[in-house]
Amino acid sequence: MSRSGARVERVPLARYTTLGVGGESEMWFVETHEQLAEAMSAPYRILGGGSNLVVSDSGVPERVLRLSGPLAERDLTPDPELSTPDLIVTGWVGGGVPLPGLIRALQKLGWSGLEGTVGIPGQVGGSVWMNAGTRFGEMFDGLHTIEIVTPDGVRQVTPDDLKWGYRQSGIPRGHVVSRVRLKLRPSTPEAVLAKMEHADQARKGQPKNKTPGCAFKNPGGVSAGKLIDEAGLKGTQVGNARIAPEHGNFIVNLGGATAADVHALLALIRERVGVPLELEYELWPEQLGG
């Protein structure tokens, strides 16, 4: 237990990533801004839902911060001062809230704005930090206010304050998205569900194994998956990691894969594809660049 009451444990990070790889590290489970400030007083990294992440087999030397308690709770009550008949602005949604559960809750309320992100794993904070999305929508489609914790304090910003874009929020690395307010449009549960099912149908070709998600960003509007397919790499395997036969831009853990296996596949893809590819994965530590 830390001075401010945060729970501190050494844990295998593989347990907390969707890929299921990663060595042991010191994890801080933070529930308050005070605990977050203490945890950020030494070198640290932020771990949300563990998607889009490949962690070294030896873990990382920094503290690993995970939002929990009140910072993983949601208040979807419309704010009476900010909401209008055509716009719903919610109470605060913690950065540690699981994104899939939030999307389901919004659908049941009949509130539209984030249904295009259906199927994305992870937590709200990390999804906002990287502006996670699909071709049907992204996190910044439904954001009103973002609360960011930095080593210098807490500040609240709007999307207009940030230089956000495709798979990027403009929030500096190491700054923590602690809470957000959502901005949504009133609709019906049936209409929102229909949009979610349409997006889900388009994702049916994606693998169901343990995976971090898409490995590379689409270069210049061209599908990275298509480029990898054309290079003849679908199904290529190193150790227990494989480029998914269903979709070339996904790497899956067949069981017992290591980060080294995944890194080898990423390097092979970059070598064989004829255009520069920028990683969508985050690497801990940053070994491949890009």
From Swiss-Prot:
Species for this entry: Deinococcus radiodurans (strain ATCC 13939 / DSM 20539 / JCM 16871 / CCUG 27074 / LMG 4051 / NBRC 15346 / NCIMB 9279 / VKM B-1422 / R1)
NCBIfam families in UniProt: PRK14651.1
Pathway assignment: Cell wall biogenesis; peptidoglycan biosynthesis
Subcellular location: Cytoplasm
Top-rank lineage group of the source organism: Bacteria
Keywords: Cell cycle, Cell division, Cell shape, Cell wall biogenesis/degradation, Cytoplasm, FAD, Flavoprotein, NADP, Oxidoreductase, Peptidoglycan synthesis
One GO cellular component, as annotated: cytosol
Record-given protein name: UDP-N-acetylenolpyruvoylglucosamine reductase
Gene this chain is encoded by: murB
GO biological process: cell division; cell wall organization; peptidoglycan biosynthetic process; regulation of cell shape
